[in-house]
């Protein structure tokens, strides 16, 4: 019996330890890329889930690399006993004060804080977690996982330049808008002035058309007596045509210098006797008798009205 027990113990001692499998689910937030301004405080969270054993402990390590191609450097580590350790250049007092690793939620959430960011802090941050538990009086790693994020630090000069460029673009847009507004106002004012000028011109033109023109012509005296003839012409309103034509001044009809005289002299014909009218003697002494003879004119000149009649009056005194 003792021999069997010793053989079984030897076989168990020679049995291999359990292999480490990547069963942990590790994620880093914010990510995959996060931007911060120079001088701000950055916070990175490492979430852990899917542990294989409930009683296992976690060892968290943060690595830093300036780029994907560069070598990763261990920054800080939290052991399974929750002790924080700093490594390399990050163990110096200047950088050590700027790094803080805390366990927010036991076995699930870990926070890395980088205070007062500098341009040299820009790069890739990797969180690697290992699940450890005690197996046969030895600490054994059961699973592990990792996740990374990229942090970009924007310098103050670059941010100022970008803000200045944005303000410059906005001001340029408003300047263009102001110019367009001024042009639109000028066009509106000019159109109003032109409209008023057209209205005034039309009113003046209509007044000129509706005005009546009179022409007075004084005929020369006859050889036989004094005769005055007046001719008045009225310009009728003509309908407007498609195109405006020049107004021709109204020319009065031509009046001959002298009334036509018959070539032969006719003896004056006495008037028919009229009824005697008894008038006072004083009035009879001052009476003067006249003989009126109507003569047809020769062919009328072109343009002269045919309704014109010329008269010749001969005066004779009757001696009583």
Curated annotation (Swiss-Prot):
The chain crosses the membrane at residues 181-201. Disulfide bonds join 46-127. Pfam families: V-set. Proteolytically cleaved to generate a bioactive peptide. It is a single-pass type I membrane protein. Residues 1-23 form the signal peptide. Residues 24-155 form the Ig-like domain. This is V-set and transmembrane domain-containing protein 4. It comes from Homo sapiens. The gene is VSTM4.
